[in-house]
Amino acid sequence: MAVFKTTLWRLISGTLGIICLSLMSTLGILLKNSFTKLSIEPAFTPGPNIELQKDSDCCSCQEKWVGYRCNCYFISSEQKTWNESRHLCASQKSSLLQLQNTDELDFMSSSQQFYWIGLSYSEEHTAWLWENGSALSQYLFPSFETFNTKNCIAYNPNGNALDESCEDKNRYICKQQLI
């Protein structure tokens, strides 16, 4: 009888040991995957006190796009000419960024990069126009009159704009308006 109890005890403790090892292994794998996902950083850092929208009622964006104030933004990490950037945005059913106001990109306020935006000079209208044909509001870029009309406009989320040859390569921002 004593031999039977010892054998049964060893069988139970061995089984519990194997179950414990399996649970520990599973926990280790889950923790490793969790830390790997956390270490992936986006191409920009959101500013303080700004909540990015993810799958909210008014904003559901594609993968690699950022939802903010019911718009979706694609912030490129690769550099392209202005026309290449424009075509890439159009292929994603969006357009190069058209700014509504200077705080539209608050979520990118820590970025120092310049990005192509959808602003170009129209010889026909003798005015700076956004891709949708609307005119530029002068309050967006107070020193705008110094820009060369043969160039394209690059914008920094800190509110700076500069004109560069359209053949230069910059990162770009695509925007999809959802509402």
From Swiss-Prot:
Function, as annotated: Immune receptor involved in self-nonself discrimination. In complex with KLRC1 or KLRC2 on cytotoxic and regulatory lymphocyte subsets, recognizes non-classical major histocompatibility (MHC) class Ib molecule HLA-E loaded with self-peptides derived from the signal sequence of classical MHC class Ia and non-classical MHC class Ib molecules. Enables cytotoxic cells to monitor the expression of MHC class I molecules in healthy cells and to tolerate self. Primarily functions as a ligand binding subunit as it lacks the capacity to signal. KLRD1-KLRC1 acts as an immune inhibitory receptor. Key inhibitory receptor on natural killer (NK) cells that regulates their activation and effector functions. Dominantly counteracts T cell receptor signaling on a subset of memory/effector CD8-positive T cells as part of an antigen-driven response to avoid autoimmunity. On intraepithelial CD8-positive gamma-delta regulatory T cells triggers TGFB1 secretion, which in turn limits the cytotoxic programming of intraepithelial CD8-positive alpha-beta T cells, distinguishing harmless from pathogenic antigens.
Give a yes or no for keyword Transmembrane helix in this entry: yes
One matching Pfam family is Lectin_C
**InterPro entries xrefs:** C-type_lectin-like, C-type_lectin-like/link_sf, CTDL_fold, NKG2/CD94_NK_receptors, NKR-like_CTLD
Q: In which tissues is it expressed?
A: Expressed in NK cell subsets (at protein level). Expressed in memory/effector CD8-positive alpha-beta T cell subsets (at protein level). Expressed in melanoma-specific cytotoxic T cell clones (at protein level). Expressed in terminally differentiated cytotoxic gamma-delta T cells (at protein level). KLRD1-KLRC1 and KLRD1-KLRC2 are differentially expressed in NK and T cell populations, with only minor subsets expressing both receptor complexes (at protein level).
Query: Which intervals lie on the Cytoplasmic side per UniProt?
Result: 1-10
| Record's subunit section | Can form disulfide-bonded heterodimer with NKG2 family members KLRC1 and KLRC2. KLRD1-KLRC1 heterodimer interacts with peptide-bound HLA-E-B2M heterotrimeric complex. KLRD1 plays a prominent role in directly interacting with HLA-E. KLRD1-KLRC1 interacts with much higher affinity with peptide-bound HLA-E-B2M than KLRD1-KLRC2. Interacts with the adapter protein TYROBP/DAP12; this interaction is required for cell surface expression and cell activation.
Q: Which GO terms describe its cellular component?
A: external side of plasma membrane; plasma membrane; receptor complex
Q: Has keyword Amino-acid biosynthesis? A: no
Q: How is it placed in the membrane, per its record?
A: Single-pass type II membrane protein
Glycan attachment sites: N83, N132
Q: Which cysteines are joined by disulfide bonds?
A: C58-C70, C61-C72, C89-C174, C152-C166
What is the source species? Homo sapiens (Human)
Q: Which GO terms describe its biological process?
A: adaptive immune response; cell surface receptor signaling pathway; natural killer cell mediated immunity; negative regulation of natural killer cell mediated cytotoxicity; negative regulation of T cell mediated cytotoxicity; positive regulation of natural killer cell mediated cytotoxicity; regulation of natural killer cell activation; stimulatory C-type lectin receptor signaling pathway
Q: Which residues lie on this side of the membrane: Extracellular?
A: 32-179
Provide the protein name. Answer: Natural killer cells antigen CD94
